[in-house]
Structures are given as C-alpha cells and as structure tokens.
C-alpha cells in the first residue's frame, strides 16, 4: 500500500540508520578474573579469645521479677514519703484549720456539684453555722468531695452529728463525723496511714457490716429493709422462674401437639398418596384388560373373517369344479375351451384368482395391523396425557393442602400465644397486687412504729427516730 504513496511521504517511512556498536565498559560477571583465590581462616585462629578466659554469663531479670521489684520499690518509696510527711505534719499549726475544733463537723462523700449554699441550707436546720470550708484541689481547682462546717454552738454540732449522717444531698448520701485531727491525740489522716476507712465506727468487721453508720436502731431498721427487699427479690425471682417453667411447659406441649399434627398430616398424605397409587394401578389394570379384550376381540374378528373367506373360496372352487352332464359339449369346443391361445390351458384362472385373493387378504391383514398400531399409539398417547394431567392435578391438590395446613398451624399458634400472654398478664397482675398490698401493710407497720412518742421526735430530714437534743 505504501508503494503508491508520493516520494515526500515515502521518505517518512524510510528506516533509520542502525545503532552503532560500542563495546561494554565493564566485563560480565563470568568474564571477570579474580586476582587472589579464596583462602581459609587458619591464620586468624590464634586471634580468637580462649573460651576459658570468657566471663561467666549474667542472669537476666524476668518480667514477673521486674514487676515485683517495681511494686516493692513503689511501696518503699511511699513509706518513705509517709515518714517524711509525718515529721512535718502538725494539725494544730495548720493555717487552713481555723475556729474551734469541738464545734467543727466533718462532712464527706459530698457530690462534686454541691455548692456551699446548698450545704448551708441542709445543715442550718440543726443550728446557726459560723463558717463552711469546702476543700478544693490546689492544682486543678476541682472539689475534693468533703468539707468542714463550724457551728456557733457545740450542741448544734452534736445534733448534726447524730441526725445528719446518711442524709441524701444532690443524690448522694453524705458521711458525717467530728473533726479528729485536733481533738484526738495521735490521730493521723488516711493519706498518712491512719483514718477510719469507709466508716467512723472502728474495726474492720463493724465497718463492713454497718457501712459507716453509728445508730444501732438505724442499722437494725436498715437491716430489716434489706431483708425485706431481699425477700421481695427472692419472691419475684421465684415467680419469674415459675412463669418461665409454665411457658416452657406450654411451649413443649405446643411443640408436641404440632409434631403429632404434622405426623398425622404426613400419614394422611401418605395414605391418600397410596390410595391414589392404588387407584392408578387399578386404572392401569383396567386399561390393560381393556386393551387385551380389544386385542382378543380384534383377533377373533380377524379369525372369523378368515374363516368366512375360506368358506367362500371352498364354495367357489366347488361350484367351478362341477360340470352339467346334460349339456353336450362339442369336441372342438371342448378342445378350444381346454386350450387357450398358443396352447395355454385355461384351467389356470382359478389359481390366479386364489393368488390375487391371498394377496388381497395379506393387504387387508397389513391394513388391520397398521390400523391397530395407530389406534394403540393414539390410545397410549391419550393415556399418557391423561396420566400427566392427573399427576399435575394431584400435585396441585397436595400443594393446596400443604398451604392450608401451614396457614391453619400459624393461626393456631398465634391464637395460643395470644391466650398465653393474656393468661400471663392476668397472673402477674394478681401477684403485683398482693405484693403491693404486702408492701403497703409493711409500710403502715413501719409508720406506726415511727410515730412520735413522748421521749423522741420524728426527724423530717432522714426519717429516723432520734433522741431530743441536749439542752
């Protein structure tokens, strides 16, 4: 194609000059020759260190040992810090500790959102307050969760000490105690290894048992409340377990009934399928019998037809073989009747007739066979189509029955579930009514016990029976 281009375009397709060959600057790896062959290390063995002069191996510290060492060092460091702080700690010369120590009340476990005005409102009910000192973190300025309240009278401090312990302020129950740093000899705060822990009573067993409360009657009431709450929880737990057992039993019964119904449906379907199969077999047998009967009938008709044909042939042969004696046949006519043209005998005509008759009979037999074969083919095709239609109808009926059974099962399960839920809703309602009645009776009993008597009064702050304040 390019040969027909003009010369100016052919010049564009001309090949370039070949790249000039330049010898490589470096030799290939297999062409390089090493000046010195490889040598052994025998001359350098004397430079090695003698194994006998090597230092003994050092034992490294394991992870567990390192953690234990760090924990021990931390404890020792903390003990050293406590000892150093104990040397310089003097509560009597503390600049932040002001006022009379015997009129000062210590309040702990205070909510971080509680303000000084809220504390003043809560503790002014016991007496006039002189000063409130809330402790804050020196670095971040956030509250530490405790405060010191100084009353104007010592009896007001004692009243607050007795009645305000366990009082709920801003969602938290506070712990109330006297100031022990300047009133108890040898007292040390908890950060220096002292303190009362989480309570103001003393021993570990008492602290854990009473959780920082001082009044024995209040402990007893609180224990009774705990026991009552525990019993209520146990009863509710037992009711839940019984309800769950009833539900499980009902579910098991429903499951068993569903399984039985499924088995019954399966057996009924199998029985109906067997009946259909038996009916099909009976129909097939009847059909085979009809076919055999038709075949036998056709064979008998063919036999009768053959017999009639034979009888007819015999009669014709008998009629042709008889010649009347009264008729005189001339000799010339007899000779001409016996001999045909060119001397052929005329007695061969019955043989040809017999041969034609046999040929015609064979043709009729073949026609009958073809007709019977076509009839059987049409009948078998019709039977196959009928069987297919019957099988299709049977599958359609089976699918319809299966869908109907499934819908019935879903409806029955839904009805049972609704009845079970209604029954369970009725049962807990009665149980809750009884439980509420029991709680109401218990609360009335407690209210009767906590009524004001001649020796004490009912505190509106925490609801405990207290002794009247000392004059």
UniProtKB/Swiss-Prot annotation:
It comes from the Eukaryota. One of its GO terms (cellular component) is nuclear speck. PROSITE patterns: RRM. The keyword Zinc does not apply. Keywords: mRNA processing, Nucleus, Ribonucleoprotein, RNA-binding. It is found in: Nucleus speckle; Nucleus, Nucleoplasm. Residues 246-259, 294-303 have a biased composition (Basic residues). One of its GO terms (molecular function) is RNA binding. PANTHER family: U1 SMALL NUCLEAR RIBONUCLEOPROTEIN 70 KD, U1 SMALL NUCLEAR RIBONUCLEOPROTEIN 70 KDA. This is U1 small nuclear ribonucleoprotein 70 kDa. It comes from Xenopus tropicalis. The gene is snrnp70.
